[in-house]
Swiss-Prot record:
A GO term, aspect molecular function: magnesium ion binding
Function according to Swiss-Prot or TrEMBL: Catalyzes the NAD(P)-dependent oxidation of 4-(phosphooxy)-L-threonine (HTP) into 2-amino-3-oxo-4-(phosphooxy)butyric acid which spontaneously decarboxylates to form 3-amino-2-oxopropyl phosphate (AHAP).
Name used for this protein in its record: 4-hydroxythreonine-4-phosphate dehydrogenase
Cofactors that this protein relies on: Zn(2+); Mg(2+); Co(2+)
Record note on cofactor: Binds 1 divalent metal cation per subunit. Can use ions such as Zn(2+), Mg(2+) or Co(2+).
Reaction equation(s) it catalyzes: 4-(phosphooxy)-L-threonine + NAD(+) = 3-amino-2-oxopropyl phosphate + CO2 + NADH
Organism this protein belongs to: Escherichia coli O139:H28 (strain E24377A / ETEC)
A single cellular component GO annotation: cytoplasm
Length: 329
């Protein structure tokens, strides 16, 4: 019999739709135990607002994990700093959000949990609370002391990884170095094999410049940096196609023969993916010593507590994490 695994969930910003979505997740059975790192009253109040049943059972790390039954969640309690009104940010709760992320991350690092699924956070309120915070990806990279992580978003049809993440456009060309590309492609290739079960990953690589530099007439980063790195990695046996112009890469001619796309920067690759599958996408952090997936949307403060939030991305993120757990066993 396969051992039941525990996954930990952080609902994210307490005034947003994250708690709503977690309550909605509880309305179905799951083959894993869902441990929610959150304030108990927050969850029960939000369930009452949505008119949905919810029973919280205490987290017992020394007991065997049990598949989650309908209407229940396992609670790993973290107390709010301020009471919550749905849709209204409270600066002190920025500390609460970071505490949930830290506890969940530490639990993955010490083997308590097989995966971490994160709800949407509000970066502004965390920074307003005096906590420098760029995003989940960078937070988990630092806390886990990972050498390097890679952000990848995925739908059922498309996976897009990023060579750089949250950088201003003016800084991107300088950031695309041979060392960076070697690291990013190695991590992407490794995790596609180990976490996604793809024996020989096929990766499409975007150029940085329009028309992938047009032979050096629209920038030389392809000639100076990207092509030499790809040639070296191909010589090691990796299946890499590129650099290709980003404006023509995202079509069936190329995508039908690829397992993932590597974009050079955030807004090069993600608009295509989000247009194609918004609400069904999943954010995955590659390179961490544990599995981490996330929703692909924001806090939607205006929908909190109204019963109008779509749980689809959270369900997809959880299902993908479960598949990744199976692939790594």
């Amino acid at each position: 019999m396969v051992k039941t695994q525990r996954v930990v969930i952080t609902p994210g910003e307490p005034a947003g739709i994250g708690p709503d979505l977690v309550v909605q997740l509880a309305q179905r059975e799951w083959p894993v135990e869902l441990v929610v790192c959150a304030d108990a009253t927050l969850l029960t109040d939000r369930a009452a607002m949505l008119g949905l049943p919810l029973t919280l059972r205490p987290y017992s790390p020394n007991s065997p994990a049990q598949p989650q039954t309908t209407g229940t969640l396992t609670l790993l309690p973290v107390a709010l700093r301020e009471s919550v009104t749905a849709g209204q940010l409270a600066i002190e709760n920025g500390h609460y959000v970071v505490e949930t992320l830290a506890r969940a991350c530490d639990g993955c690092l010490n083997g308590e949990f097989a995966a971490l699924i994160t709800g949407p956070v509000h970066k502004g309120v965390i920074n307003d609370a005096g906590i420098p915070f760029t995003g989940h990806t960078e937070f988990f990279e630092e806390r886990s002391q990972a050498k390097k992580v890679v952000m990848m978003l995925a739908t059922e049809e498309l996976r897009v990884a990023l060579a750089t993440t949250h950088l201003p456009l003016r800084d991107i060309a300088d950031a695309i170095t041979p060392a960076l590309l070697h690291e990013v492609i190695a991590i992407l290739h490794h995790d596609l094999r180990t976490k996604f079960g793809i024996a020989e990953p096929r990766i499409l690589v975007c150029g940085l410049n329009p028309h992938a530099g047009e032979g050096g007439h629209m920038g030389t980063e392809e000639i100076d940096t990207i092509i030499p790195v790809l040639d070296e990695l191909r010589a090691q046996g990796m299946k890499l196609n590129g650099p290709l112009p980003a404006d023509t890469l995202f079509q069936p001619k190329y995508l039908d023969n690829a397992d993932a796309v590597l974009a050079m920067y955030h807004d090069q690759g993600l608009p295509v993916l989000k247009y194609q599958g918004f609400g069904r996408g999943v954010n995955i952090t590659l390179g961490l010593p544990f599995i981490r997936t996330s929703v692909d949307h924001g806090t939607a403060l205006e929908l909190a507590g109204r019963g109008e939030a779509d749980v689809g991305s959270f369900i997809t993120a959880l299902n993908l994490a479960i598949k990744m757990i199976v692939n790594t066993q």
